[in-house]
Swiss-Prot record:
Keyword vocabulary terms for this entry: Aminoacyl-tRNA synthetase, ATP-binding, Cytoplasm, Ligase, Metal-binding, Nucleotide-binding, Protein biosynthesis, RNA-binding, tRNA-binding, Zinc
NCBIfam families, per the entry: thrS (TIGR00418)
Family statement drawn from the similarity comment of this UniProt entry: Belongs to the class-II aminoacyl-tRNA synthetase family.
Gene Ontology process terms (BP): threonyl-tRNA aminoacylation
GO molecular function, one term: tRNA binding
Residues that, per the record, bind Zn(2+): 260, 311, 441
Native source organism of the sequence: Mycoplasma genitalium (strain ATCC 33530 / DSM 19775 / NCTC 10195 / G37)
Protein name (record): Threonine--tRNA ligase
Main location as per UniProt: cytoplasm
InterPro entries associated with the record: aa-tRNA-synt_IIb (IPR002314), aa-tRNA-synth_II (IPR006195), aa-tRNA-synth_II/BPL/LPL (IPR045864), Anticodon-bd (IPR004154), Anticodon-bd_dom_sf (IPR036621), Thr-tRNA-ligase_IIa (IPR002320), Thr/Ala-tRNA-synth_IIc_edit (IPR018163), ThrRS_anticodon (IPR047246)
Assigned EC number: 6.1.1.3
Length: 564
């Protein structure tokens, strides 16, 4: 995919000497490139550009790559303020620069061997602020598909068309679930009424399962003194992913990226006996993480999120049973939503990367061994992922493959011996001495944002009746004649706790029916002359075109309650 980025950069540089490049990357089979020039592109130009790009790949003689220092890289891009900014923001010591003729390009993960013969299809052009910051200049973004044969390109285009139908970003707009606005900021989702209802339905189900599992609900602030995150180690190991500190009353405060430090302090409010262990806390936690703007993908990766967070404080002899129970809880809850995970990872630390993980080899050996033994006891197939652990401990990650063929983590179990040490957490054991508990972090469905993104892609927005934000829509045939009866039916259904809308637009019946289909509302109730005479008998139609049926009001309510 990055070969497509290079070809587009070369074409732009040859045509516009002063072009400047912003972020680039790929999602599945689709690449994108941000750039700044004093000319606006349109899709009408794509055919000519595609022809130029496809012929360009055969003319790349003499192309080469070289690793250089930051100072040398900056000198190559002296007149490109955006690339210079990106170079400075990266954490790299060496930079892979690609040279072609007298031009140079920075595409860090590019492999030249893939550029032999190209077939490119450009998909769209849009505008966005550099790094998602409204105070910055607007850049143009071109998305495209790169292939090495015509047959492959045709297949990728076909797959892309199918993906668009399932893309959670377009479905979110179509179903009026969520939106984004540059005045609020990149990666900061706005939940609309239907999306908020969907969140509440999901949350209510998960909260009930948490209660059955023995979790106590707590609530803690989104802000904390910077010292809290220094004690926990987040400031040292996670600072680059946290929002900058805010100065309040001469104190440095930070938006939390995780809830565990807060829950450690909640546990510390009381001295527990070994008989009262484990202690299980749950919270719908609002978190803020400063994700790179180029990595923001709809709800899948955002900067403000709500995590259904759970922490188990237990004795060492309870670790295995608590992890097994948490594993089964995750499977049970996600099965209700139709999820079968594509992969389960055992995420381990990388002993060569001491800056990313705590330096305690003995602790890592013990915690990683315990996690692996649990997976073996459960007879679970898993894949080891070196370097994917949390900085404080190993994880079991439940992975879902998106429509862009990218694995994302939906649920997780993490084992943590570190934070009890950091916060000096203790309980009283049988011998009346103080012992350190162990923390098990459990994300049953992860964040609402990512879970709903995955749910939309899995269902194409066709939610089962129990999960649909709007279960039924009432459609009066004629506003003048039938609206009064439709309103009466609407109020009757509301009293029965049915999630129902009333379409009181002046449009023709056929248009209202089409709109209900677009919004994927499971049931349509048509109110005409028959219903005016008797609202105890309803005319019902499924949005997928099921046969129109006559059903009593009571049986309709029973059906919705049964299936919903």
């Amino acid at each position: 995919m990055l070969a497509g980025v290079l070809l587009l950069q070369i074409w732009l540089k040859c045509k516009y000497a002063n072009v400047q490049f912003g972020e680039h990357g790929f999602n599945g089979d689709e690449f994108y490139l941000d750039f700044y020039i004093n000319e606006n592109f349109s899709t009408k130009q794509f055919a000519k550009i595609e022809s130029d790009l496809n012929s360009l790949s055969s003319k790349l003689e003499g192309i080469s790559q070289k690793f250089v220092s930051l100072d040398e890289a900056l000198s190559f891009f002296e007149n490109d303020q955006f690339t210079k900014n990106l170079l400075k923001k990266s954490n790299l010591n060496k930079f892979k620069i690609t040279f072609f003729e007298n031009k140079h390009f920075w595409i860090e993960d590019l492999t030249l061997t893939f550029i032999k013969k190209s077939f490119i299809k450009l998909l769209n052009v849009s505008v966005n602020y550099f790094l998602g910051d409204p105070s910055q200049l607007q850049l143009q973004r071109i998305n495209g598909i790169f292939a090495q044969s015509k047959k492959e390109l045709e297949q990728l285009i076909k797959e892309n068309e199918e993906r668009l139908k399932k893309d959670h970003r377009s479905l979110g707009k179509q179903l009026e679930l969520f939106s984004f606005d540059p005045l609020i900021g990149a990666g900061l989702p706005i939940w609309l009424a239907k999306g908020t209802t969907l969140r509440n339905i999901i949350g209510n189900f998960v909260h009930h399962q948490q209660l059955l599992f023995g979790f106590n609900t707590v609530c803690s602030p989104v802000l904390a003194n910077i010292e809290l995150f220094k004690i926990s180690g987040h400031y040292q190991h996670y600072k680059e992913d946290m929002f900058p500190a805010i100065k309040l009353d001469s104190q440095a405060m930070m938006l939390r990226p995780m809830t565990c430090p807060h829950h450690c302090l909640i546990f510390k409010q009381k001295r527990y006996s070994y008989k009262k262990m484990p202690q299980r806390f749950s919270e719908d936690s609002i978190l803020h993480r400063f994700e790179a703007s180029g990595g923001l993908i709809g709800l899948e990766r955002v900067r403000c999120m709500t995590l259904l967070d759970n922490h188990i404080f237990c004795r060492a002899d309870q670790i295995k049973s608590e992890i097994k129970n948490a594993f089964n809880l995750i499977q049970k809850v996600n099965k209700k939503f139709g999820f079968i995970f594509d992969r389960i990872d055992l995420s381990l630390h990388d002993p060569k990367n001491q800056s990313k993980f705590i330096d305690n080899p003995g602790l890592w050996r013990e915690s990683e061994s315990q996690m692996e033994n649990v997976l073996k006891d459960l007879n679970i197939q898993y894949q080891k992922e070196i370097g994917a652990a949390a900085f404080y401990g190993p994880k079991i990650d439940f992975q879902f493959k998106t429509i862009f063929k990218k694995m994302i983590t939906i649920a997780t179990i993490q084992l943590d011996f570190l934070l009890p040490e950091k916060f000096d957490l203790t309980y009283i054991d049988k011998k009346n001495t103080l012992k350190k508990p162990v923390i098990i972090h459990v994300g049953i469905i992860g964040t609402y944002e990512r879970f709903i993104a995955a749910l939309l892609e899995k269902t194409s927005g066709n939610f089962p009746l129990w999960l649909a934000p709007v279960q039924a829509v009432i459609i009066p045939v004629n506003i003048q004649k039938h609206l009064k009866a439709a309103k009466k039916l609407y109020n009757k259904l509301l009293k029965e706790n049915i999630r129902v809308n009333l379409d009181d637009n002046q449009d023709r019946l056929a248009k209202k029916v089409r709109q209900a289909i677009i919004e994927k509302i499971p049931l349509q109730l048509i109110v005409g002359d028959k219903e005016i005479e008797n609202l105890e008998k309803l005319t019902c139609r499924g949005f997928k075109g099921e046969k129109i049926t006559r059903i009593s009001f009571n049986n309709f309510v029973k059906r919705v309650r049964r299936d919903g």
